[in-house]
Swiss-Prot record:
The gene is SEC31. The COPII coat is composed of at least 5 proteins: the SEC23/24 complex, the SEC13/31 complex, and the protein SAR1. SEC13 and SEC31 make a 2:2 tetramer that forms the edge element of the COPII outer coat. The tetramer self-assembles in multiple copies to form the complete polyhedral cage. Interacts (via WD 8) with SEC13. Belongs to the WD repeat SEC31 family. Its main location: membrane. It is found in: Cytoplasmic vesicle, COPII-coated vesicle membrane; Endoplasmic reticulum membrane. SUPFAM superfamilies: WD40 repeat-like. Component of the coat protein complex II (COPII) which promotes the formation of transport vesicles from the endoplasmic reticulum (ER). The coat has two main functions, the physical deformation of the endoplasmic reticulum membrane into vesicles and the selection of cargo molecules. GO terms for molecular function: structural molecule activity. This is Protein transport protein SEC31. It comes from Chaetomium globosum (strain ATCC 6205 / CBS 148.51 / DSM 1962 / NBRC 6347 / NRRL 1970). WD repeats lie at residues 6-46, 65-109, 117-157, 161-201, 204-247, 251-291, 294-334, 375-403.
Length: 1258
């Protein structure tokens, strides 16, 4: 509740019905102001909720004096004559006065009429909600009048005079002629104005009726309240069956004075009364939602605002009218520290708690509920809901529909068409289709190139695309390639001329790569010059000439076979042709030498020589960087013809860069495509994508911006996808964390995945998201959305699911309980805990939800939920020896019923000790919870779970009796909200509980429980005095609810020889730093008979093993004779024990099953996190938790104790802890403990502590 405004008046009030909330107040009859003023006023107040500078306390906007005080006041609806409505006052002097609200605000004379038909005070009045001009008034002696505010002289009376006053009146909200009244005599009368007679009377058991409220939706439902302090009840009546109320709402401590049933939501009701409280209810279910901040005096009137039910006003006799909101979800402010330090005062140890004013409705009010709604869902889903028509009073329901939705159906169909063709591998069809539909020449050229690259002979197709097909050589004229040959007349010399072969006669157009390296034609030429034996010619020649000429030096080198020297001589003399002829005889190295020398002399002129120089020298970079861009196509053909495959992509990229820098984007795109440079061509395509979107927006079409963008992006993705497929692209940057060359492409993939997912094609979206790098910024969110939308919902694990049933006793499934064993108690479902995670332990019952995970474990491994994870406590063995540290017992005949335990009570001794650092500020705090002072239930059996049964254990003379419940404090008009711990006997001081009587202390508090007399059945000298506290860690844990004062003595423990006192579940401590309760022993002491009976059910009871025989009986008088016990069947002989399997050493984790490794990892990580952040004071507790978790891991490593289904439950708990869902983790832990006790070894306490510590650790 947020307190918005306060009106400093003790007055009756009414809300205006206009849009701006106004309040009218009239001085309340029967109240005295703080200054004892007798002035009576009618005042108007404006809330000014929108004014930020408006203070909490208001000032009236209009005020007039009246002759009498008000019992009640009402504000009618506006009308044509009265635009602000009419204010009616029920006056103490018996008059009915009417004022015009508009004139009151204007400061004019506002009195409309004053009528005195009533002979006594008018106690109540109300306007008819269906006929605003009709007003009903009720008062003393049973007087009931109905008025017409337009003509008050026509008022008529209903009924006759009666002995009792009518204190309340209410019009039916559905039938305008039905009126109900409630009298101080306890009768509720329903009137019918058509007949002007009472049609029905409800008997309220003679209890005065103080308030009536009609159901806003059901005309036959009626609420009544009584102001009787003994029976402060709200009754819900159904007039169809008026013999008894249909429901009873009980929650007030004293009489109820006012009711207000919300007109907009029949599930909301507000009541207030003499207990100073204002409660919020659901009258249809009887549930109490919460409570407004408590006043310091009676709250006599409360009302919803009729136009804005979020606002509620409540008037009280403490002189305030409070305007506040219906609910507040913020945490309440912690109460101030207590200053009372009187140790003798009972309430000093139980400080009064200021009740928190925060609660949330369990359901949304109807005015917040939408009758119809729609929402887009991820994956192309459209979710719509609408409210079903339900009869009045029936639970409301809604219908939800999930349908598919597509922003642009063309986008979805285009995506499906492309994906189908791509899966078939029909790349050519995709290219042809897109080329035909291309909007620009650039786009068409891209698809044509992609188709050419997709062919098996891609380079050949590129050459054809550029217009350089190989077949063009056939069209070359023979004259261009013929070489003129000299004609010589053959002479008859006997030398036969060579016969040319038909193939050799054809002129070959060799590739340029074999221009100099292929010497086949030269070989053929020389071979044609074969010598003929005996051939003689008439052309003699000299090998050597006269002198040292060039020819002579060359000839000498030739005849010596030194062709290299001959070549050098020719090159020196610039005889290049002769050098080539000689180089053919000397080998390829000489040929290359001559080529190099020749090309160096020509210096690239003509151009074909520079080109051939680049080809021969395998240096095509000269062509790429220096060739004129006007011949880029010829350059590309040269690269396709001569470039090595390893250099070809880089050469194409370099050529494309030159072209792109010159401004020809389309030609550059071609080069990038041919060179398989995806990162280069993508940047160009992104620019083309943006241009296509701009062009689409400028066109006069009905397409939306989204549709244009989606279609353009679809074409872009199709080109990229086909290109990746053609070049078999492998992305080597998926593992990088930044600096991606394809960053622009990844952005488009993300956009495209979002679009196709919005059209329901989640598998397609997932495929493109898989192409993104792992660390790409937008990839993680997109992947998670698709993964969550495509994954199947796993069935909810039973160990974490919320149980809808109430507490279920499991005793029936365990069979009869053998004598000496405690019947297992039912375990209630786990609720939220409000304990301090750093507080020391205090006792609760085993099923309580607020125990200490660090308290010593006794005979059970059970640790309730919500425990304090860092409370210092000594470590105790999980199964201590029975009776080892308790008082001795007197044993009687086995099986004999025990006498009732003696009663002995005493105040707990005061112990002053240094609390150390236990009260450090916790990491997590919770708002305090309002509690009442608990009382101790009487003991009807020695064991908490066997109420009404006699104890099977004998009671020894040294056993201490159960505590006597303390008397309640005197009841006042407004009892304080306080909590305390019931006094119980202190624990034994030594091993056997003996202690000198001089240590006993008495409590002089008037509210402390008196000491009880010695129980019957014990000799007077044997009554043991109360024992003092002890610091031994092996004493029994104390019993009782947690103390509310952190410095008050903690409740003491009972000795082991006595069964635990059945106390109610202890509520969580109100103080966030108060000691948290510790677990009480849920198991009974060991049986005290000679032999144990065999189990009577298929499932053995859980508890300590029976003793083989009783110890010797202790001294003391034996108890009286009892009935003989039933005969017991001896147990069957034990089977021979099998040798234990070999165990792996502790700490070994190499044999943990694979299905448990995830759980072990999560628990270990969270344990390390807690250990690193826990305060140093709680290091022993953290270490003990680590040790207990290690025991669990050892069990898993050895394949023992924990079954596979339990491992699944533990994995779910570990996942819940990792996800900080501690409520689910606690529920899962309780499920395992309840259903699989036999598997819960010492590790269960460690698991429970880890949940609590993890919850408390930020």
């Amino acid at each position: 509740m947020v307190r918005l405004r306060e009106i400093p008046r003790t007055a009756a009030f009414a809300w205006s019905s206009g849009p701006n909330p106004l309040l009218v107040t009239g001085t309340r009859s029967g109240a005295v102001d703080a200054d004892f003023s007798d002035e009576t006023k009618l005042e108007l107040w404006e809330l000014n909720l929108d004014a930020l500078d408006q203070g909490l306390e208001l000032q009236p906007v209009a005020s007039i004096s009246t002759e009498s005080r008000f019992y009640d006041i009402a504000w009618g609806a506006p009308s044509d004559e009265h635009p602000r409505g009419v204010v009616a006052g029920a006056m103490e002097d018996g008059s009915l006065q009417l004022w015009d609200a508009a004139k009151l605000l204007a400061g004019e004379e506002a009195v409309m009429s004053r009528d005195t038909k009533h002979t006594g005070p008018i106690k109540a009045l109300q306007f008819n909600p269906l006929r605003p001009q009709v007003l009903a008034t009720a008062g003393s002696k049973g007087e009931l009048f109905v008025w017409d505010t337009n003509d008050t002289s026509t008022a008529f009376r209903l009924g006759t005079a009666a002995a009792h006053d009518i204190d309340c009146v209410a019009w039916n909200r559905k039938v305008s002629n039905i009126l109900a009244t409630g009298s101080a005599g306890g009768f509720v009368t329903v009137w019918d104005l058509k007949t002007k007679k009472a049609s029905l009377t409800l008997n309220n058991n003679r209890k005065p009726v103080s308030a009536i409220a009609w159901d806003p939706t059901n005309s036959t439902n009626l609420l009544t309240a009584t102001s009787d302090d003994n029976t402060p009840l709200i009754l819900l009546w159904n007039l169809r069956n008026s013999q008894a109320p249909e429901k009873t709402l009980q929650g007030h401590d004293q009489g109820i004075l006012s009711l207000s049933w919300c007109q907009q939501d029949p599930g909301l009701l507000i009541s207030c009364g003499k207990d100073n409280r204002t409660l919020v209810w659901n009258p249809q279910t009887g549930e109490r939602y919460g409570e407004f901040p408590e006043a310091t005096n009676w709250t006599f009137l409360t009302r919803f605002n009729p136009g804005n039910p979020n606002l509620v006003a409540t008037a009280s006799f403490d002189g305030k009218i409070t305007v506040q909101t219906l609910q507040n979800t913020n945490a309440s402010v912690a109460p101030a520290a207590q200053t009372n330090t009187d140790d003798d005062d009972f309430f000093a140890k139980a400080p009064t708690e200021l009740q928190g004013a925060s609660f949330s409705l369990t359901r949304a009010p109807i005015w917040f509920e939408r009758p119809v709604g729609v929402s887009f869902g991820y994956g192309g889903k459209l979710i719509t809901f609408k409210k079903n028509d339900t009869p009045a009073g029936q639970p409301r329901s809604s219908k939800i529909q999930i349908s598919s939705f597509s922003v642009d159906s063309d986008i979805g169909s285009a995506t499906e068409k492309f994906e189908e063709a791509y899966k078939r591998g029909d790349i050519g069809a995709i290219c042809d289709s897109n080329a035909a539909d291309a909007q620009t020449e650039e786009e068409k050229a891209d698809w044509q190139v992609l188709k050419a690259l997709s062919e098996s002979d891609g380079r050949t197709k590129i050459l054809e695309y550029l217009g350089f097909a190989k077949d063009d050589e056939a069209s070359t004229s023979p004259e261009e390639t013929e070489v003129a040959e000299p004609k010589e007349e053959p002479k008859e010399t006997g030398l036969a001329p060579p016969q040319p072969n038909g193939d050799d006669a054809k002129k070959k157009h060799k590739r340029v790569t074999s221009m100099w390296g292929d010497l086949d034609e030269g070989d053929d030429f020389l071979s044609d010059l074969t010598p003929a034996k005996g051939a003689k010619t008439d052309q003699p020649f000299q090998l050597l000439g006269e002198g040292n000429t060039t020819e002579d030096r060359v000839t000498k080198a030739i005849i010596l076979g030194n062709f290299e020297k001959a070549v050098d001589i020719c090159l020196k003399e610039d005889r290049v042709a002769d050098a080539f002829i000689l180089a053919n005889c000397g080998g390829k190295e000489l040929v290359d030498k001559v080529q190099t020398s020749y090309l160096a002399q020509k210096k690239g002129t003509p151009s074909y020589l520079r080109l051939i120089n680049s080809v021969i020298g395998k240096n095509l970079w000269d062509v790429v960087y220096n060739a004129d861009l006007g011949n880029w196509k010829e350059t590309m053909v040269t690269l396709c013809t001569f470039a090595e495959p390893s250099e070809f992509p880089d050469l194409c990229e370099a050529l494309g860069d030159r072209i792109y820098e010159s401004g020809s984007r389309q030609d550059a795109s071609f080069c990038y495509l041919v060179g398989s440079k995806l990162e280069k061509v993508v940047d160009i395509w992104v620019v083309e994508l943006q241009e296509a979107e701009q062009a689409g927006l400028q066109e006069a079409s009905n397409d939306s911006t989204f549709s244009i963008h989606a279609r353009s992006l679809q074409h872009f993705i199709e080109k990229v996808t086909v290109f990746r497929h053609v070049i078999k692209f492998a992305d080597d940057e998926k593992e990088l964390t930044e600096g991606w060359k394809l960053g622009s492409l990844y952005d488009k993939y993300t956009q495209y995945a979002d679009i196709v997912a919005a059209h329901g094609q989640l598998a397609v979206a997932q495929r493109y998201l898989d192409l993104l790098p792992t660390k790409f910024p937008a990839a993680e969110v997109a992947r998670n959305r698709v993964r969550l939308a495509t994954q199947k919902v796993a069935p909810q694990a039973p160990q974490v699911a919320q149980r809808q049933t109430g507490p279920i006793s499991r005793a029936a499934s365990r069979g009869p309980t053998p004598m000496g064993y405690q019947q297992p108690a039912s375990i209630p479902p786990v609720g939220p805990s409000h304990t301090n995670p750093y507080a020391p332990p205090a006792p609760v019952q085993p099923a309580a939800s607020s125990s200490n995970p660090y308290a010593p474990s006794t005979t059970s491994q059970f640790t309730p939920a919500g425990a304090s994870p860092y409370a210092p406590a000594g470590y105790a063995p999980p199964h201590p020896a029975p009776g080892g540290y308790g008082p001795p017992q007197t044993f009687t005949q086995p099986g004999a019923p025990a006498p009732p335990p003696p009663r002995n009570t005493g105040p707990p001794p005061k112990i002053h000790k240094d609390p150390g650092s236990w009260n450090d500020v916790p990491m997590v705090t919770r708002p305090p919870v309002r509690k009442t002072t608990p009382s101790v239930a009487p003991i009807t059996a020695p064991f908490g779970a066997q109420a009404g049964l006699q104890s099977p254990l004998p009671t020894g003379p040294y056993q201490r009796g159960a505590p006597t419940p303390p008397p309640p404090p005197p009841k006042g008009s407004a009892p304080p909200r306080s909590v305390t711990s019931p006094p119980v006997g202190p624990p034994p001081a030594g091993p056997y509980g003996a202690r000198p009587a001089s240590v006993t202390s008495n409590t002089p508090s008037p509210y402390a429980p008196p000491p009880a007399a010695a129980a019957a059945g014990l000799p007077s000298p044997m009554v043991p005095p109360p024992a003092g506290r002890t610091a031994s860690p092996y004493n029994a844990p104390p019993a009782g609810p947690p103390p509310s004062n952190r410095y008050a003595p903690a409740p003491s423990a009972q000795p082991y020889g006595q069964g635990p006192t059945p106390t109610p579940l202890a509520p969580p401590p109100a103080n966030p730093y108060a000691p948290a309760p510790a677990a009480q022993q849920p198991m009974a002491p060991p049986p005290q008979q000679y032999t144990a009976p065999p189990p009577q059910a298929s499932r053995p009871p859980v508890g300590p093993p029976p003793m083989s025989g009783p110890p010797p009986a202790a001294g003391g008088p034996p108890p009286a004779a009892r009935a003989a016990p039933p005969q017991q069947t001896p147990p069957p002989p034990r089977a021979a024990a099998t040798p234990p399997a070999a165990r792996h050493p502790a700490g070994d984790r190499s044999h943990i099953p694979p299905d448990a490794q995830r759980m072990v990892e999560l628990l270990s990580q969270d344990m390390q996190r807690v250990a690193s952040k826990a305060p140093a004071t709680f290091a022993p507790q953290v270490k003990d938790t680590q040790k207990r978790l290690g025991l669990l891991f050892d069990h898993l490593n050895n394949g023992e104790l924990v079954r596979p289904d339990t491992v699944e439950q533990l994995t779910a708990i570990a996942e819940a802890i990792a996800g900080k869902n501690y409520d689910a983790a606690s529920k899962g832990q309780m499920e395992i403990f309840r259903d699989k006790v036999e598997e819960c070894g010492q590790w269960m306490v460690g698991l429970k502590r880890l949940i609590s510590m993890s919850k408390a650790t930020p």
